Amino acid sequence: MILLALPNKGRISKPVNEILEKAGLKISVHGRSLFAQTVDPEIKVMFARAKDIPEFVRDGVADVGVTGYDLMLERDTEEELEMLLDFKFGNARLVIAAPENSTVNSIEDVKDGMKIATEFPGLTKRYLEKKGLNLEIIELSGATEIAPFIGVSDLICDLTSTGTTLQLNRLKEVENVVSSTTRLVANKKSMDDPEKSAKINQVLSGIKSVLYAQSKRLIMMNAPKDKVSEITSIIPGMGGPTVSEILSNDKMLAINAVIDENKVFETVTNLERLGARDILVVPIERIL
């Protein structure tokens, strides 16, 4: 049996749960319970704060978990966890920012003794030390953007996705500390256990199959027999398109193929030009 730690709230919680459900790992949640069972009796779920998950997995409380790369660095657990997968979403950057009217425009303008407010004291301290800077770090638990305007700090170190929040709060970016995405991580001892690692790899495989399918589409059509060669040349598919007879029409063939989502518009245009008809483009839930 393995225990999977998932964020109990926040912007990555919903998409992660949706991916697991598409992978076939439906979670049975009862009220506000901190634990839940999945359709697989050998996989149990624990809901926790995303910031605590790196330590829970490192310490073996959970065998595998989903968290942000920034949170792994904050808890200084990066080297102690087995990195299994980058979900490629939940993108954010941890940046140092200053008020728009500040004389600090780059990291070179930051001076020893300045105050910096952050929800990431560990990561901020290590980064500043690497830059040879000694600042007073003020740990806050939210609303970091207000700190410079109420005399709490000179600078902030906070997460941003688009930079819009910084601009709305009259702040300017001074330095990019680290870029972060959502990660799947595992306990190293659990990965050394044959039974647990096998189950963890099942979870990993399921997630990968969903993520891979997100960028693909199944395209189906009926096409003239004399155009099949041209049509199959523009939809190579995965291992080649599937071509089959249409019982009610001996002049047409049915063709199915998997194509990249970003090529759908161009492909459909070319297929219509070649005489394909009854074209269907369908999302795919999983590709294994």
From Swiss-Prot:
Q: State the UniProt keywords alphabetically.
A: Amino-acid biosynthesis, ATP-binding, Cytoplasm, Glycosyltransferase, Histidine biosynthesis, Magnesium, Metal-binding, Nucleotide-binding, Transferase
Q: What is its EC number?
A: 2.4.2.17
What does the sequence similarity comment in the record state about its family?
Belongs to the ATP phosphoribosyltransferase family. Long subfamily.
Q: Where in the cell is it found?
A: Cytoplasm
Q: Which cofactor does it need?
A: Mg(2+)
Q: What class of enzyme is it?
A: transferase
> What's the source species for this entry?
Methanococcus maripaludis (strain C5 / ATCC BAA-1333)
Pathway assigned to this chain's UniProt record: Amino-acid biosynthesis; L-histidine biosynthesis; L-histidine from 5-phospho-alpha-D-ribose 1-diphosphate: step 1/9
Example GO biological process term? L-histidine biosynthetic process
> What InterPro entries does the record tag this protein with?
ATP-PRT_HisG_long, ATP_PRibTrfase_cat, ATP_PRibTrfase_CS, ATP_PRibTrfase_HisG, HisG_C, N-reg_PII-like_a/b, N-reg_PII/ATP_PRibTrfase_C
Q: Which reaction does it catalyse?
A: 1-(5-phospho-beta-D-ribosyl)-ATP + diphosphate = 5-phospho-alpha-D-ribose 1-diphosphate + ATP
Summarize the activity regulation: Feedback inhibited by histidine.
According to its UniProt entry, the function of this protein is described as: Catalyzes the condensation of ATP and 5-phosphoribose 1-diphosphate to form N'-(5'-phosphoribosyl)-ATP (PR-ATP). Has a crucial role in the pathway because the rate of histidine biosynthesis seems to be controlled primarily by regulation of HisG enzymatic activity.
- Principal subcellular localization: cytoplasm
May I have one GO cellular component term? cytoplasm
What protein does this entry describe? ATP phosphoribosyltransferase
Any single GO molecular-function term of the entry would be:
ATP phosphoribosyltransferase activity
Q: Does the keyword ATP-binding apply?
A: yes
